[in-house]
């Protein structure tokens, strides 16, 4: 049987797309492999958010060129595909830089992958168009991959933040209909999925057609999904502060399937830098939004994204970011040094922050965020919480899952609990995971 190796870089959307490309190839008779050396088709599903991520792809392509040659010497053909946002942004440039690549395909065209692979027998192929048809209408049924699953409901972004390539690589905001999303969710649950994370570049800008033909909000969509039998939990990511509607806030208080966790990027605490980033909100507007969300769901866990060293950022600007982090308190966060991306307005600026200053600021920010994360996890010790068991744990007799607040937990229980929700008493907080015991385990130890 033919074998396909699919490697994904970057965001949850890419993870979803990688899985769907594997589904497309499976429908053509390819079995998935984790061993690139035995693959007849190698797909790199790429990320273009930061320069380092893009350069990793070219390093990997250099290694694949050698592998392709070695397999050819032993009589095996290998097709190499570059997909995702680097493919969309760089197109034919990839063919120039990486001679071993056979197919370059953008994120809106991967449903055509079988045809593109056939065409590549004759000539190298680039498809980075934004097709008129909806790719989701041409994708095969999804294969079950576990207890949790991503489900794309929205793609693209109209915000045009000054640092971001997404509007150029993913296009304008488009949303799937409520019916299409509910249908895919129902099939996921029938396959064993119990928690679904709704994903989009700007997921709370969701505006797919509802049952009456009128645009529905993300809150309305989650209400519809809560009626899917067997679905236990709902999450969503990534959101923009400017699209946070009242009904979405209300969903955190009224919909029992919506988990008390929110990833809401702010990027900076400085109003001057937020304006330069074209974020169209202030630090205080973000604070007020968080206050409203916490009023609706007091126990909600908050996560965010931060960029340090954006062009023109001063010590005073960075101090405002540190103040915002201190004011709000996060359970987790992602922070990065600014990386210029070609074609974005920020890349044209000449007031770059020195690399050494970026490094120093990032270290200070990450130290504060790490302290907040450790404090948040430590506060969980002694609490009783419901864990959705996702898989076996690191040690025999152990399983692993997540709290409603997206904290990883390890505890002793049989593998038969996978896919169920188990009450667990948290007994210890590690650096990245919590540890606990079931009520039965605690009683036995007493």
Swiss-Prot record:
It is found in: Cytoplasm. It catalyses: N(6)-dimethylallyladenosine(37) in tRNA + (sulfur carrier)-SH + AH2 + 2 S-adenosyl-L-methionine = 2-methylsulfanyl-N(6)-dimethylallyladenosine(37) in tRNA + (sulfur carrier)-H + 5'-deoxyadenosine + L-methionine + A + S-adenosyl-L-homocysteine + 2 H(+). Its EC number is 2.8.4.3. Its cofactor is [4Fe-4S] cluster. [4Fe-4S] cluster 2 binds at residues 157, 161, 164. It is an enzyme of class 2 (transferase). Binds 2 [4Fe-4S] clusters. One cluster is coordinated with 3 cysteines and an exchangeable S-adenosyl-L-methionine. Catalyzes the methylthiolation of N6-(dimethylallyl)adenosine (i(6)A), leading to the formation of 2-methylthio-N6-(dimethylallyl)adenosine (ms(2)i(6)A) at position 37 in tRNAs that read codons beginning with uridine. Belongs to the methylthiotransferase family. MiaB subfamily. This is tRNA-2-methylthio-N(6)-dimethylallyladenosine synthase. It comes from Methylorubrum extorquens (strain PA1) (Methylobacterium extorquens). The gene is miaB.
């Amino acid at each position: 049987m033919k074998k396909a190796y699919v490697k994904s870089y970057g965001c949850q959307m890419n993870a979803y797309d990688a899985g769907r490309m594997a589904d497309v190839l499976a429908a053509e008779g390819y079995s998935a492999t984790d061993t690139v050396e035995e693959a007849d088709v190698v797909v790199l599903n790429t990320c273009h958010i930061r320069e380092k991520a893009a350069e990793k792809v070219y390093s990997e392509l250099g290694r694949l060129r050698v592998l392709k040659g070695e397999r050819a010497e032993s009589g095996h053909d290998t097709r190499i595909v570059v997909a995702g946002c680097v493919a969309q942004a760089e197109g034919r440039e990839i063919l120039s830089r990486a001679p071993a690549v056979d197919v370059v395909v953008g994120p809106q065209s991967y449903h055509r992958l079988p045809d593109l692979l056939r065409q590549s027998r004759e000539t190298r192929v680039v498809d980075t168009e934004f097709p008129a048809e909806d790719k989701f209408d041409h994708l095969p049924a999804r294969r079950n991959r576990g207890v949790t699953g991503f489900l794309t409901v929205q793609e693209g972004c109209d915000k045009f933040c000054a640092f971001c390539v997404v509007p150029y690589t993913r296009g304008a905001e488009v949303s799937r209909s409520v019916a299409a999303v509910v249908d895919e969710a129902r099939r996921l649950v029938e396959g064993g999925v119990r928690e679904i994370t709704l994903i989009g570049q700007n997921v709370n800008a969701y505006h797919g057609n509802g049952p009456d033909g009128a645009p529905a909000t993300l809150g309305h969509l989650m209400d519809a999904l809560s009626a899917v039998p067997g679905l236990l939990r709902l999450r969503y990511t990534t959101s923009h502060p400017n699209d946070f509607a009242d009904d979405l806030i209300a969903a955190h208080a009224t919909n029992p399937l919506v988990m008390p966790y929110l990833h809401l990027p702010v990027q900076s605490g400085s109003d001057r830098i937020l304006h330069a980033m074209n974020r169209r909100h202030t630090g205080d507007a973000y604070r007020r939004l968080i206050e409203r969300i916490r009023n609706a769901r007091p126990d909600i866990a908050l996560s965010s994204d931060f960029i340090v060293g954006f062009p023109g950022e001063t010590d005073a600007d960075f101090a405002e970011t540190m103040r915002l982090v201190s004011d709000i308190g996060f359970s987790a966060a992602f922070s990065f040094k600014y990386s210029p991306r070609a074609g974005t307005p920020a890349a044209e600026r000449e007031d770059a922050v020195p690399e050494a200053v970026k490094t120093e600021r990032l270290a200070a920010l990450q130290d504060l965020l790490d302290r907040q994360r450790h404090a948040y996890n430590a506060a969980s010790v002694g609490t009783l919480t419901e864990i959705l068991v996702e898989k076996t744990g690191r040690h025999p007799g152990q399983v692993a899952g997540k709290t409603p607040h997206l904290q990883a937990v390890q505890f002793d229980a049989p593998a038969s609990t996978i896919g169920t929700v188990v009450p667990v008493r948290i007994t210890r907080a590690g650096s990245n995971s919590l540890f606990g015991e079931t009520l039965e385990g605690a009683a036995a130890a007493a």
